[in-house]
C-alpha cells in the first residue's frame, strides 16, 4: 500500500510560478505527497518538495513536440511518487480547487482518468486534454508505462498521440472515438471544476516542457 492517499506530480521545467504553485499545493493539500519531475538542466535549489531530474530527450525530426518530454518526465515521477490517487499536472499552471480530490472521489470511476474539458473533444479523434490528469496510480501507470517514443516522422499533437496510444495500442479498443471516449476519460470543467490558472495564458514565458 502507498504511504499517501493523495499525491501531486508536477512535470516540466522550473517555471516562474512553480515555487508559488508548490506553496499553494502544500497549503491546500497538507497530507499529499508532492513530487517535481524536471530536467537535470533546471535549477531546483529553491524548490521545496521531493524532486527527480532526468536527461532531456533529443529533439525529433522533421517534426518536434513535447510528447517524449512528457513520457520521460511523467514516468520518472510515477516511479518516485508514493500515493494511491495522483494529480498529474504541469509546472506552469495552478489548480486552485481545494476540493479537487473530493471531486474525483465523488464523480470519477476508479477505472477512468479525470481530465479538463478545455483541449478535449469528441469531434477530433483521440483529443483528450493533457493539461492535467487525475486518476489512481494504477490507471496512470497503465496510461504512461506503455508508450512508444514519438519519432517525429509525422505531425501529431502530444495529447492525441498519448490518448491514442492508451486506447488503441494498450487497451486494444478501435471503436470510434466519439463512442468510447467516456469509457476511458471523465471530463470535468476546466474553469469551474479544476479552477486552472495557466502561466502560458498570462505571460510571455516560453511554453513549459
Which residues fall in each region the model found?
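N-proximal low-complexity "stem/linker" segments adjacent to membrane-targeting elements
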Residues: 1-16
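Short loop->beta transition adjacent to catalytic acidic/histidine clusters or analogous donor-positioning motifs
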Residues: 4-6, 26-36, 49
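Soluble or luminal CAZymes and related metallo-dependent hydrolases
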Residues: 13-17, 65-76, 154-161
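Short, well-formed alpha-helical segments that are part of the catalytic scaffolds
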Residues: 15-28
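Active-site-proximal specificity loops/subdomain of glycosyltransferases
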Residues: 37-80
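Short aromatic/hydrophobic "clamp" motif used to bind/position activated sugar donors
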Residues: 86
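Acidic donor-binding/catalytic loop of UDP-sugar-dependent glycosyltransferases
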Residues: 91-105
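Catalytic core and acceptor-binding pocket of nucleotide-sugar-dependent glycosyltransferases
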Residues: 95-98, 113-209
Amino acid at each position: 500500500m502507498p504511504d499517501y492517499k493523495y499525491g501531486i506530480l508536477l512535470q516540466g521545467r522550473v517555471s516562474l510560478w512553480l515555487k508559488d504553485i508548490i506553496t499553494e499545493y502544500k497549503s491546500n493539500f497538507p497530507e499529499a505527497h508532492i513530487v517535481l519531475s524536471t530536467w537535470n538542466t533546471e535549477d531546483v535549489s529553491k524548490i521545496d518538495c521531493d524532486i527527480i531530474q532526468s536527461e532531456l530527450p533529443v529533439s525529433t525530426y522533421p517534426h518536434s513536440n513535447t510528447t517524449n518530454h512528457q513520457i520521460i518526465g511523467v514516468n520518472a515521477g510515477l516511479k518516485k511518487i508514493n500515493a494511491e490517487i495522483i494529480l498529474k499536472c504541469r509546472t506552469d499552471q495552478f489548480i486552485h480547487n481545494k476540493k479537487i480530490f473530493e471531486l474525483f472521489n465523488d464523480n470519477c470511476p476508479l477505472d477512468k482518468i479525470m481530465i479538463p474539458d478545455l483541449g478535449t473533444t469528441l469531434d477530433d479523434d483521440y483529443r483528450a486534454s493533457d493539461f492535467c490528469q487525475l486518476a489512481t496510480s494504477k490507471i496512470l501507470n497503465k496510461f504512461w508505462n506503455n508508450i512508444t517514443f514519438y519519432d517525429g516522422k509525422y505531425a501529431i499533437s502530444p495529447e492525441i498521440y498519448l490518448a491514442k496510444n492508451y486506447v488503441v495500442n494498450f487497451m486494444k479498443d478501435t471503436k470510434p472515438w466519439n463512442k468510447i471516449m467516456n469509457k476511458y476519460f471523465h471530463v470535468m470543467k476546466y474553469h469551474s471544476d479544476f479552477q486552472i490558472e495557466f502561466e502560458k495564458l498570462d505571460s510571455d514565458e516560453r511554453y513549459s516542457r
